[in-house]
């Protein structure tokens, strides 16, 4: 069932891409006559110690995913990053699983970033300002995951002019509004999408209906010349129904997030940021059956709630020394499964008990810069309470780099991370449901990693980045009986993990040609119950390439050919 749905959606979304782009895969954009572009910036910006940012301005040259500028799909093309199984919208980094990557959307944790069963993500290309993946050194300001940090931020609205855009496709509709609240003082941004392939799905004999919709909003206002307040919201929902002779099955999931941020500049040497947030994920499954006087209706929900806060200070103590310090707090509630049913008029209500996880952390990072040298030395101290036990973790982190100039550099880093959350997958009526639970038996997951890499400018327009890493993990839970696990009756064992690999990325940029190619070799193993075996998502060799070329370039018009190979 799941495979049929995935194949059908894939064909539909490919059709959407063909409908929304010209037949020759050429994209068009207007250029101002008086502007001369000497060279494009690369699509991927490789920073030190495994941190890579996507150049949002250059994303317009990239091929569309199902007619969408999906930033998350490009993150999956980075060296050392995998989407997992076909169609997944996860980020599996350096031998880790999807739950080991912390995904922040304007500093709000996201538990399910998928639209259309993983073919697209919740991050609209019309609203994203920046996107970055940290695989090596991760600032002590962030924790609670073993493998990586992904930060995606939405842009502000235009503070000068009101703007509108509308995109109408064969299967989708999208619109964006932004502009000033008060000129030069504040702005608003509203963007919405609606995907409706029902007309095409109706061709199939099994009467499947599917769609998703989402809306993103952001308000920003300068309450003082040194203090800026912003409010961000997101809400999205996927829904599918399958009708048969006497039965109707429905599935769906949705995210809701909200954040309030205050950014302050106290003086030339001290800045602060305070964020309060709420995030909510719901998975649901609904069935209804009627035949010969018998009726059965049931609805099962799986929910995750989290609210929290983060306070960060950046302080410059001298020309060579600066500090980043602060605190975080979060309260998470997990409702693994709750079922309501009505069988011939009889009401039933059952489910697993809710679980709580309360956590807090203090962090400090020292940053030293002199000449071409840069060093970061920091520590994160965290506490996790699951209502039965409290566990503590101390996570030292450090990196050292040297910049030779002209885009040549080397770096070395070492990190220790801990994790108190467990994610596993279970199928209900052939549909996958992700469960999140806190740690069990007083054991946190732990990992340490060392990375060594460098970047060299081989030619005026050619840059090569290479990085190797080695990682160890322990207390990794392997769940073999989900019912016993959710009931607190065992159903799992602990294991260890090991991963090492080499990542390389080659970038070539000229005025008309942009080429980015990446290769990853990785070996990831797990060991549990005395048996060592390859990690489920281990891909020893992975190659991706993206190229775009301005086929025709003349004043007032430009034709760009783009191609992606994986």
Feature-to-residue mapping (PLM):
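Gram-negative outer-membrane beta-barrel transporters
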Residues: 470-472, 492-566
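Short strand-turn segments of transmembrane beta-barrel domains in outer membranes
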Residues: 118-121, 129-140, 148-179, 187-210, ...
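Surface-exposed extracellular loop regions of Gram-negative outer-membrane beta-barrel proteins
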Residues: 185-192, 196, 239, 272-296, 338-342, 354-388, ...
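Outer membrane beta-barrel strand-and-loop segments of large Gram-negative receptors
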Residues: 306-312, 351-363, 439, 443, ...
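Transmembrane beta-barrel wall of Gram-negative outer-membrane proteins
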Residues: 171-196, 205-239, 250-278, 317-323, ...
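Periplasmic N-terminal accessory/gating domains of Gram-negative outer-membrane beta-barrel systems
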Residues: 48-96, 107-138, 155
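Short, acidic, small-residue-rich periplasmic hinge/interaction motif at the N-terminus
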Residues: 20-61, 98, 265
